[in-house]
Regions:
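Cytosolic catalytic domains that perform sulfur/thiol-centered chemistry
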Residues: 1-129
């Protein structure tokens, strides 16, 4: 489930990594945090990372925020990110481990087998780079 930052660096060095690995920033904050994760993502993110928008990857027909998406909604959103069943998805968040477990759990809920969370998130990445 967890991948360490030093192992992720080794994957980046291997030129073949882009064939199967998709890196997602799943950062999200409560409204009172007064932080905008999409803006933060645009300013700084892991190389080649994509943004996993929990507001979009939820059941948009519900009146409640961040409800579990249907399987079709989840698959549609993952296909837009270029993710398929063969992808090894590595998820991180800006604040340590924060919100990345929620994204990991959604992948596991819908039977995606190869998904990991970057242990320590962006903080761990920056600590060794």
């Amino acid at each position: 489930m967890l991948i360490e930052a030093n192992k992720l660096i080794k994957l980046y060095i291997d030129k073949e990594w882009k064939k199967n690995i998709v890196i997602l920033d799943a950062s999200w904050y409560l409204p009172n945090a007064k932080r905008e994760p999409i803006k933060e993502f645009k300013n700084t993110h892991l190389p080649d990372a994509l943004y996993f928008d929990i507001d979009q990857v939820s059941d948009t027909s519900s009146n409640l925020p961040h409800t579990i998406p249907t399987k079709n909604q989840f698959e549609f959103n993952m296909q837009k990110l270029g993710i398929n069943n063969d992808s090894h998805v590595i998820i991180y968040s800006m604040d340590g481990i924060g919100t990345s477990p929620r994204a990991w759990w959604l992948f596991r809920l819908y039977k995606h087998k190869n998904v990991s969370v970057l242990n320590g998130g962006m903080k761990a990445w920056k600590a060794i780079n």
